[in-house]
Amino acid sequence: LKQALGQHVRSSRYLEAVASGDMRCDLDGQPVEAVAPEHVQHAIVEVFRRRQGKDAEKARAWARARFVQAIDASGLDRDAYLERVRTQDATALSLIDEACAELAGQAARREALVRAFRASGKAVEEFAEMYGLDAALVRDALAREQTA
């Protein structure tokens, strides 16, 4: 059993599942708890290392996107996230910095969108059509602004 579990948790399939940040499941497939940010970070870095030999650029883009998703899902800022995951790996730190920069850019775009919407005085659907946006994107930006 120990060998089987060891082989399973080192498999790419398992690591990719952990890197996705999905909930941990019990033996019946029912969600049990969230995966800890440090486990997600470790899985992302391990999958990145494995993929880097095939196509380094694609692997880096994948890892950056996963870190964006992981940091956003954790609800932590950069410093709190780094304190939680406690990594000294230069590659991981670089990817985390890139992800945090991307998250900051997304937040700035959302903030600008919300300000433009408020200034327009239009309904969500009218505003979205006026700027060629999806109304769901505008609603999401408004919802995120209200929870922040």
List each model region and its residues.
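Short, Lys/Arg-enriched anionic-surface-contact patches
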Residues: 86-109
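Short, solvent-exposed alpha-helical "recognition" segments
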Residues: 106, 138-148
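Short, amphipathic alpha-helical "recognition" segments used to contact nucleic acids or chromatin
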Residues: 103-121
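Short alpha-helical "recognition helix" segments of helix-turn-helix
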Residues: 81, 126-129
